[in-house]
Amino acid sequence: MFKEMNLNLKQMGNMIYEDPTRIQEEEDIVQEVSTTFSDEEDNSSSCSLSSSMCSDFTEDDDDDDVSSSSSNGPLEDLSDLMSHLPIKRGLSKFYEGKSQSFTSLGNVKSLEDLMKRGFKSRNYGAKRKSSRSTGGILDQSYKRVFSPKATISKKPNRTPSSVLSCLARRRH
């Protein structure tokens, strides 16, 4: 496949440029690219383009390769995946799961306490009823304070231009 590309590039280069030195330079570039691609196919390393860049790149990534090489193939099981994921650190180092409205987890004596407390905190009906009882009063006062006020504005006097012209003539 690469040889076919080389031939096509050479033919295109010969057709476009008649300068023999430029043709030779292009052939050299094409040859370098084709050897680079063939080297990459032969080696599993992706650093065959430049040895100086390759050495810089591999020195930085050596530590990462050691940590990722501890796995034995693809992660097929969820527990394998979980062991490779970073530990999630939140505000509480001692409690994992959904947050509850306990002021201290020391107050929790059993899982039943957690379940009861969780369901009580999810009882939104009582909260909604209490807000409805005071909501009417708050809504009325809010409407009185923030509603647009009725204003009476004077309409500008519109006098016909003929009247204005007459007034202007009388003054002179």
Curated annotation (Swiss-Prot):
Instruction: Tell me the segments the record calls region Disordered.
Output: 34-79, 148-172
Keyword hit for Cell membrane: no
Induction pattern: Lower levels in the dark than in white, red and far-red light. Induced by wounding in an ATAF2-dependent manner.
Alphabetical UniProt keywords: Nucleus, Stress response
Keyword match Nucleus: yes
Which spans does this entry mark as compositional bias, Low complexity? 44-56
Q: Where is this motif: Nuclear localization signal 2?
A: 142-149
Report where it is expressed, by tissue.
Mostly expressed in stems, shoots and leaves, and, to a lower extent, in siliques and seedlings. Barely detectable in roots.
Q: Where is the composition biased (Acidic residues)?
A: 57-66
Q: What is the effect of changing K98A?
A: Abolished ability to confer tolerance to stress (e.g. metals and oxidizing chemicals such as Cd, As, Cu, diamide or t-BOOH)
Task: Recite the lineage of the species.
Answer: Eukaryota, Viridiplantae, Streptophyta, Embryophyta, Tracheophyta
Per the record, the major location class is: nucleus
| Motif annotated as Nuclear localization signal 1, chain positions | 115-122
Q: Which GO terms describe its biological process?
A: regulation of photoperiodism, flowering; regulation of response to water deprivation; response to cadmium ion; response to copper ion; response to far red light; response to light stimulus; response to oxidative stress; response to red light
The UniProt function text for this chain reads:
Promotes the tolerance to a range of metals, including cadmium (Cd), arsenic (As) and copper (Cu) and to oxidizing chemicals (e.g. diamide and tert-butyl hydroperoxide (t-BOOH)). May act as a chromatin remodeling factor for stress responses. Negative regulator of flowering, especially during drought stress, probably to prevent precocious flower development and subsequent low seed set. Repress the AP1 promoter in a SOC1-dependent manner.
Phenotypic consequence of K88A:
Abolished ability to confer tolerance to stress (e.g. metals and oxidizing chemicals such as Cd, As, Cu, diamide or t-BOOH)
What is the protein name given in its UniProt record? Answer: Protein OXIDATIVE STRESS 3
Cellular component per GO?
nuclear speck; nucleus
